[in-house]
Amino acid sequence: MSINATARSLLLTEFISAFFLTMRYFFKPKPTINYPFEKNPISPRFRGEHALRRYPNGEERCIACKLCEAVCPAQAITIEAGPRRNDGTRRTVRYDIDMVKCIYCGLCQEACPVDAIVEGPNFEFATETREELYYDKAKLLANGDRWEREIAKAIELDAPYR
């Protein structure tokens, strides 16, 4: 062992340099957030939990065109259309999304001609059972009613890119 190596090991230079490096980072502001209590802002293009929207008069937007069902690569959407109404329009009788299969690609949202199906701002929807991840029309409409303000704002902010 050389004299230089012996001096370095006796004086603990590596230990001291590592200690000062640690102290330098110890007093800097932390780059992480305290997650459950603080949340980062999400992008207007964020794709979270699905929702069905309504028109301002309360009528559901979905016209049962089944484009979202056709374009879904995971085949997670099931739609049954009701009979035509007197005014010639159709509405859905059944609108189910299997969130276990869903890959959150956003193709259903892009395919919808009336902005009925959207992916909302919620990303915290963990459940205890798989059955809770099978969303029916009532659950999707409730999600849409709950987040209508946030969804409308996100669509407005994203309008130049559509």
From Swiss-Prot:
PROSITE patterns referenced in this protein's UniProt entry, alphabetically: 4FE4S_FER_1, 4FE4S_FER_2
Top-level EC class as recorded in UniProt: translocase
Binding locations of [4Fe-4S] cluster 1: 62, 65, 68, 112
UniProt subcellular location: Cell inner membrane
Positions of the 4Fe-4S ferredoxin-type domain: 52-82, 93-122
Membrane topology: Peripheral membrane protein
GO biological process: aerobic respiration
Cofactor note: Binds 2 [4Fe-4S] clusters per subunit.
EC number(s) reported in the record: 7.1.1.-
Predominant cellular place of this UniProt entry's protein: membrane
Positions that bind [4Fe-4S] cluster 2: 72, 102, 105, 108
Superkingdom assignment: Bacteria
Subunit structure: NDH-1 is composed of 14 different subunits. Subunits NuoA, H, J, K, L, M, N constitute the membrane sector of the complex.
Family annotation (HAMAP family): NDH1_NuoI
Task of the protein: NDH-1 shuttles electrons from NADH, via FMN and iron-sulfur (Fe-S) centers, to quinones in the respiratory chain. The immediate electron acceptor for the enzyme in this species is believed to be ubiquinone. Couples the redox reaction to proton translocation (for every two electrons transferred, four hydrogen ions are translocated across the cytoplasmic membrane), and thus conserves the redox energy in a proton gradient.
Name under which the protein is recorded: NADH-quinone oxidoreductase subunit I
Name of the coding gene: nuoI
